[in-house]
Amino acid sequence: IGLTNFDTDHLLVLLRHGFPVVSNQVVVSLLDQRALGDMTTEVLKNGIKLFAYGVLAGGFLTERWLDKPEPGNSELNDWSKMKYKRFIDETGGWENLQIILRALTSVAQRHDVSVANVATRWVLDQPAVGAVIIGARLTESQHRQDNLTIFSFVLDEEDKSLIAESMADICRLKGDCGDEYREPPFLTATGDLSHHLDSLPTVYEPIAVPGKTDRTQVFSGTKWEKICGHSRAVRIGNRILVSGTTATHGQDVIVCRGDAPGQAVYILDKIKASVMSLGGSLSDIVRTRVYLQNAEDCEAVSLVHGRYFGDVCPANATFEISQLIDDYLVEIEAEAIVEG
């Protein structure tokens, strides 16, 4: 299976559930190195290759922009430039880009190649990268012949050191691969998702509770909801209560059997989907309770919890309990308060 813009947690869910993943297409460039941390560690461990796009940051990592004034919005005349200008702003601004371009120019002159060649060679040299995807506008610009030059030279230690020094003040983009499409700030051409979709449907359908004017609930379709007579989540006024949730797909498929952090990822996805379906958001969650089959899994599951909630920091309690049913290793419940 080939993936696009998967973050590390969700790539691992697929692997731990038994799917044969061979590649993940993600942004990798001198400006965006999110894929070079945990993602690289895991894909190297599992024989997966990264297909890198955004390598030239919409053309900003080329000679064209060296020593040029920062462009205004009217000069960003295509979707790609509009998108990657936001990457530049988030990573430290126009002057930091110029510092990188000057270093790339110095390296390019040493090897008698283009700045784009150097920027691309740097990405190809990353151990997890199997290929780069370089865009072309057939009616405007294409650089197929120049791109072949990438294979005519290598970056030596002096080159790599100079490039690394130029990136010393670059701010790391928040989050993981693909988060620019999932969480604000959206690093897209428009700064939101409006040019990708009109609206995002809820995962679960809210259902009014008969006889209760201020109460709605959602169901995720597990067999336990039917057996036990409970909803996945219920909203009363501005309060949303999410039932203890396990890594169950559909009626009874256990996700990531035997893997606690993988189960935690799937569970928190379901909790987030439940809260959003009832009009809330992840940032509205004020309390979570985590139940573990084994205390040894506490740190791994807590790291997943921390990556999900970040600065939200809900109140939390984590317990080791005597037993969970079947092969579940984690169960999580949550409470949210929707303001406004």
Q: Predicted segment positions?
A:
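Aromatic-lined glycan-binding groove of carbohydrate-active enzymes
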Residues: 35-79, 114
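Terminal-tail/helix-coil boundary detector
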Residues: 45-49, 69, 73-106, 110, ...
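Conserved, mostly hydrophobic/aromatic
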Residues: 1, 24, 43, 53, ...
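Structural preference for beta-strand elements that scaffold enzyme active sites
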Residues: 2, 20-25, 47-51, 130-133, ...
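Acyl activation and transfer enzymes in specialized metabolism, enriched
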Residues: 105-121
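N-terminal presequence-like segments and the immediate start of the first folded domain
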Residues: 58, 73-74, 188-269, 273-286, ...
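Glycine/proline-rich, positively charged
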Residues: 1-34, 49
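Active-site beta-loop-alpha junctions enriched in small/polar residues
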Residues: 3-9, 27-29, 55-58, 137, ...
